[in-house]
Amino acid sequence: MVLQKLGDAQRILVFGDSTIENKLPVIRALWEASESHPLLKAFLQQAVEIIQEETQKLASHEGSLFLHCIDVLEVAEVYAEADEPDELIASVLALVARFGALVLDLERDDSNKRSVGPVSILGFCTGLLAGAVAACAEDMIKVFDLACEVLAISFRLVVALVRRSKAIEPNAGLWATTFIRISKEELEMQLDDYNLHHGLSQDKKAYIGVSSQSWNSVFAPPSVILHIARQCPILSQISQVPTTAAMAVHASHLSRPDVNWILGSLPGLETPVLPDRLIVSTSTGKPFLAKTLRELIQSIIADISMNILDIDGTIHGICSGLDMTKPVVISAMGPSPNIPALTRRLASGGVQLKTFAVIAGDRPRRVVPRRPSSSGYSS
């Protein structure tokens, strides 16, 4: 029901990031749905061809799993049994799921072959890339075409970010941990002290990449994250949980990725952003001012690779563009842990709400405090 006319209801499309769920359940659900939805089936087939074509351009150790599987379902099944995180595989599977959900949702209703609106689009981290397709595609065929092109762009972006991270520290492992029950300001002071005390270089320092009122995600190389979580006398005492990110993102202090290489020369990049679509930057909370898909993705690459993700500011920004006197329909393109915060914000303004899960998957993992270690505080 993403673009279906529902009376005067306003629509919000929500695209989560790549860290929020086990990839297998949502890929399996899409695979099963494709048996009765030929356009989705065609997209999933095309997706694996695009992924394999891009993988063949890489070094032999990069994404090799993609070349040994016949379809995205097999990739998801094999990766579900993996011992170590692989951000390239995880992110690409999540992107296929987001794009696939968009294709499926429009295919379910033939009346969606024309542009309707307005539509507000909320994407978190790599979810913004699927949101860009929704911002520029006016019908099912355009969604299909742009989803295929932007999937290739997204693949190259993830490759660039993984390479940037491995150049800092090649070891496998998680690049993030999430702290709760501590303010951003206090956590920043603790991290500044930690970075200074341990003499960490600019590229290895711990930093806040994702922030909200109730929790903050800290990124750093795996060895630093492990030390922070288990051995640091002060930081290890603060309630935190591991976060399944295996590369550095939202990092203003790191080198900018090669945008020209990431974008390539695909024809769909000149597609205009539709006037009845509003997609919000996760760093400023304001609508992107891009006129074309190319300009939009350039801004999105900056938000993903360089700019801090402000959860509360983004939700405030999307709500500021709504008429709070009219009902709102939220279409969730897969699970997202940020949907409850969005619904609370809207409900507090007295808005009538309905939320649709476009595709089923694992419920987003809740942030549960880990027991502090028994070691005491020290300076």
UniProtKB/Swiss-Prot annotation:
It is found in: Membrane. GO terms for cellular component: membrane. It comes from the Eukaryota. Pfam families: SAT. It is a multi-pass membrane protein. Its main location: membrane. The chain crosses the membrane at residues 87-107, 116-136, 141-161. Keywords: Membrane, Transmembrane, Transmembrane helix, Virulence. One of its GO terms (molecular function) is transferase activity. The keyword RNA-binding does not apply. Pathway: Mycotoxin biosynthesis. Part of the gene cluster that mediates the biosynthesis of the selective antifungal agent ascochitine, an o-quinone methide that plays a possible protective role against other microbial competitors in nature and is considered to be important for pathogenicity of legume-associated Didymella species. The pathway probably begins with the synthesis of a keto-aldehyde intermediate by the ascochitine non-reducing polyketide synthase pksAC from successive condensations of 4 malonyl-CoA units, presumably with a simple acetyl-CoA starter unit. This is Ascochitine biosynthesis cluster protein 8. It comes from Didymella fabae.
